[in-house]
Amino acid sequence: MWSFPIPFWGLWTNYLDKPVPVALMSAASQDSKYKFIPKHLRKQMKECVMSYCYASVRDEDTQKMFSYITDGQCCPPVTPDPVFAFNQNAASLLPSKADIMKRYGLSDNYLLVSFKNDKRSMVSQTWLNELQNIATQHGVQCVSLPFSTSRSAGELDKEICLPLSPVDWYALLKYSCGYIGNNMHPIVVCIHNAVPFFSFDNYGTKHANGLFCDSSTSKIRHILKVADLLDCRVASNSLFRHTPTPSHVFDKLQTFDRDKCVSFAQVYLKKYNEMMVTIFERIGCDSH
C-alpha cells in the first residue's frame, strides 16, 4: 500500500562499495493514507528520508507526509514538476506542428479529450456528443487522446491511437487549441504552453469505499490553486460529483486566461532552475 521498499527510498545504496548521494526531486505521495503507516515501517522510512542529500515534493500533501513520517525533522520545499522545464531542456526534440498535423490527420484547430474508462472519472457518450457538436460549430475538431496504456473512454470522430511516443504526446498537447480530461501531466503541459484546459480532476483521497473524496490532497488542485486557475477544474472522482455541461466547459476554454498561465509558468521555471542548482550543489556536481 505504501510502496516500501522500492528504489524510490534509496535503500539500494546500502549495496554499493562506495556510497553515492541520493536526491529526491518533486516527489508525490499519490494520495497515500500515510497516517495509517505502522510505527515500525514509519521508522524505516524516516531513516531513508533523513539519508537523502536533498528532498523536495510536488504538493503540500506530500510535504505533510514527509513531516509526519520524520516526526517533523524533514519538511521539504514544494517544487515544480520537472515537466514545467521541458521547453527549456528538450524543445529541440519536438516535431513541428505541421508534421504533427500531417501524421495524425488533424485540422489547424483541434481539441484533445481524454477520459479514463472509469465511471467515477469519465463523462457519458451523450456529453461527448454534445461537446463535439459545440466544437464543430466553432470550427474546432474534437480528438480523443489515449493514456499510456489504454484508449480514452467514449467515441469521437477522430482518435489518436497507441502506440504514441512521449514526444509526440507532448507535441499534440502543445499545438492543440485546448484539452479536456483527467490526469495531471496534460495540465502541466497546457499550463507552461498557455494552452486552454479544463480538468476533470481524478486525484484525491477516497473515503467510505469511494463514496466521498477529499480533493484537498489532489496534485492538480494544488497546482491550479497556486496558479489561481481553480475555475478550470472540477473534482470528478466522487460518486456525488457535479458534472459541468459541455457548453460550460467549452466556454471556459474560449475565455481562458493565457496571460495568467504565462506569468505562472515563468515563476515555476525559475523555481525549477533554483531547485536544480541546489541539487547539483548538494550532490557535488557542476550545474553548468
Residue map of PLM features:
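Active-site anion-handling motifs in enzyme catalytic cores
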Residues: 1-288
